[in-house]
């Protein structure tokens, strides 16, 4: 098995990130992880220039990170973190959209919550409510496929107990990631997945069939900033 951090960002797209792709890859390699899912922000406030040009850059940033990871022995899978205009306190990580879905698809942040879920499911993707207890409350769990234990050390707690209760109530999948932006130390956390997984499609099929993979959850920070 290998540890996969299912939530991280690079500065090339996520404007709140301080870490470029090469540094991100090097950090995860040094930490000993086998894989990551790059989930850069897909949010109206992060778009620079024309939308169609921006989504191409979004995909290019992933390809850059994937290529850098390949050279270092780190597998990099493709994900998206969408913040809908209608509910900007809520973020959703989507696993299973293709690069073509992102480049040719609608402006995902402009979709309603229901329409975003429908779009993800129409592409056979899985949609997770990221950090559902961070400055917000969980959405309707019947609409989504999973939720996340988020170990970003900027916040007081990963809310593991509450997230698990939410997941149990609706039979949701669970993921885990550090939400690393380079603004704090990198929490050691993630999901244990087979080393044989090589592609994003294989990763998505694994979490589709294994709703509750073993998680590595970082302890809550002793001195959070918030």
Where are these regions (language model features)?
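An N-terminally biased module of ancient metal coordination in phosphate/nucleic-acid-related enzymes
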Residues: 1-78, 83-86, 142, 161, ...
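Charged catalytic cores and adjacent phosphate/nucleic-acid-binding surfaces used
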Residues: 1-6, 10, 14, 20-26, ...
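Conserved beta-strand positions in the central sheet of alpha/beta enzyme cores
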Residues: 37-38, 128-129, 148
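Short, flexible loop segments at the rims of nucleotide/cofactor-binding pockets, characterized by
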Residues: 12-16, 54-55, 103-108, 125-128, ...
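Surface-exposed amphipathic alpha-helices with a cationic face
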Residues: 3, 29, 66-70, 112-126, ...
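Active-site-proximal loop/helix segments of hydrolase catalytic cores
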Residues: 18, 109, 123, 128-139
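Binuclear metal-dependent hydrolase catalytic cores centered on His/Asp/Glu-rich metal-binding motifs
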Residues: 90-124
